[in-house]
Amino acid sequence: MIPGEILFADGPVAYNEGREVTRLTVLNAADRPVQVGSHYHFAEANPGLDFDRAAARGKRLNVAAGTAVRFEPGIPVDVELVPLAGARVVPGLRGETGGALDA
């Protein structure tokens, strides 16, 4: 191995295996693109995005950590969401949850 070398595994990397998946269609009704990161509490995403926020409560995008999904104006996008794990506490963000999801 060479210092700094990256050795890739064969095949795709599995993530969020066995997690309950919620599928939603999201429409960006705003006039500018909106990007949502992998671990952002999706129910609190930009208010310009039109989707079932109640179904998204306590969930995040089912994408690789550190990535994001970009929503262009007027274009519907189907997304998959998985439940937030760990302590399931959502501090700050847009202030709509502000604490424990399961309280």
UniProtKB/Swiss-Prot annotation:
Documented EC number(s): 3.5.1.5
Subcellular location: Cytoplasm
Family matches, as InterPro entries: Urease_beta-like, Urease_betasu_sf, Urease_subunit
UniProtKB keywords: Cytoplasm, Hydrolase
An annotated GO BP: urea catabolic process
Record's catalysed reaction(s): urea + 2 H2O + H(+) = hydrogencarbonate + 2 NH4(+)
GO molecular function: urease activity
UniProt pathway: Nitrogen metabolism; urea degradation; CO(2) and NH(3) from urea (urease route): step 1/1
Family under the similarity heading: Belongs to the urease beta subunit family.
NCBIfam families membership: PRK13203.1, urease_beta
Protein name: Urease subunit beta
Species of provenance: Streptomyces avermitilis (strain ATCC 31267 / DSM 46492 / JCM 5070 / NBRC 14893 / NCIMB 12804 / NRRL 8165 / MA-4680)
Lineage, broadest ranks: Bacteria, Bacillati, Actinomycetota, Actinomycetes, Kitasatosporales
Gene this protein is translated from: ureB
